[in-house]
């Protein structure tokens, strides 16, 4: 089951949402989820999971990986046939995994992902969350076309939402929508958005604005924040944030794992 996370505008919160939902899903359900990124970014998934002062802290939980793996063994990639041929970081034990970026050269990463990881991803039978670049990445169009579910990150802005419907209507049948950095006191609240655009309530969720969450994520402590607040031990705002994150995760995973017969969103 391939789940592409994508946004139709800049700074829509794709990577942060993918990471938060991946963590919440494996804490809630007995799933195995592997995270992929189809583009190089210094602000990728690991930014939210590990403090920046510990750049090599992921060394111990890495499987099939050592420093320089891809540079030394790129010839193996041409003949690789499964995920066993690629490095995988175990983020949460027996639940959440991550395929790390293997070069800081954005063009090389784009090319290698398209040529070598896309064939593996096509055959991948478990749940894959894919941070999908908007724009001209070689693999982005293919990922969006072949994904079982496309998680569309939207800003809480009526113009931006309208822009999605005008320009990307082909994604609607497989889409699950998330309003990122959601402000519940905004005049453009979820009820108004649903009414204005006709969303089905089971196909849209929110990730609320939270200073504490943003602070934790910015310092690489998202795992700690979500794990600590998962059982509701934080402040009232923390509780509200986690309840909405859990609800959004539940709605998405219903579509991903429990409803294999993907129907029309509208």
Q: Where would I find each of the regions flagged by the language model?
A:
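Walker A/P-loop phosphate-binding motif and the immediately C-terminal alpha-helix
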Residues: 2-48, 114-117, 121
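Conserved beta-strand segments of the P-loop GTPase G domain that flank and frequently precede/overlap
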Residues: 5-6, 36, 100-101, 129-131, ...
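P-loop/Walker-type NTP enzyme "switch/lid" segment
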Residues: 35-120
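Loop/turn-to-beta-strand initiation segments
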Residues: 94-96, 122-130, 149
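P-loop/Walker A phosphate-binding loop and immediately adjacent motor/lid segment at beta-alpha junctions
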Residues: 106-115, 164-187
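Inter-motif core of Ras-like GTPase G domains
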Residues: 137-157
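Beta-strand-loop-alpha "switch" segments that mediate conformational coupling across diverse proteins
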Residues: 181-183, 187-232
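NTP-binding/hydrolysis catalytic cores, primarily Walker-type P-loop NTPases
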Residues: 223-266
């Amino acid at each position: 089951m391939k789940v592409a996370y994508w946004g139709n505008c800049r700074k829509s919160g794709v990577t942060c949402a993918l990471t938060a939902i991946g963590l919440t899903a494996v804490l809630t359900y007995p799933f195995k989820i592997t995270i992929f990124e189809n583009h190089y970014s210094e602000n990728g998934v690991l930014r939210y999971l590990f403090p920046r002062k510990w750049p090599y802290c992921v060394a111990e939980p890495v499987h099939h990986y050592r420093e320089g793996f891809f540079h030394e063994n790129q010839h193996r990639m041409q003949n690789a046939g499964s995920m066993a041929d690629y490095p995988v970081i175990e983020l949460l034990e027996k639940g959440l995994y991550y395929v790390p970026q293997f070069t800081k050269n954005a063009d090389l990463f784009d090319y290698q992902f398209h040529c070598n990881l896309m064939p593996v991803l096509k055959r991948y039978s478990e749940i894959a969350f894919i941070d999908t670049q908007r724009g001209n990445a070689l693999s982005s169009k293919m990922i969006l076309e072949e994904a079982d579910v496309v998680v569309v990150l939207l800003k809480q802005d009526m113009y931006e939402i309208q822009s999605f419907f005008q320009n990307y209507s082909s994604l609607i049948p497989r889409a699950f929508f998330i309003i990122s950095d959601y402000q519940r006191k905004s005049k453009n609240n979820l009820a108004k958005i649903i009414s204005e655009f006709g969303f089905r309530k089971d196909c849209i969720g929110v990730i609320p604005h939270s200073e504490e969450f943003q602070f934790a994520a910015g310092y690489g402590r998202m795992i700690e924040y979500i794990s600590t607040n998962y059982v509701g031990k934080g402040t009232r705002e923390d509780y509200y944030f986690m309840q909405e994150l859990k609800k959004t995760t539940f709605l998405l995973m219903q579509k991903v794992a429990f409803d294999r017969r993907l129907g029309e969103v509208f």
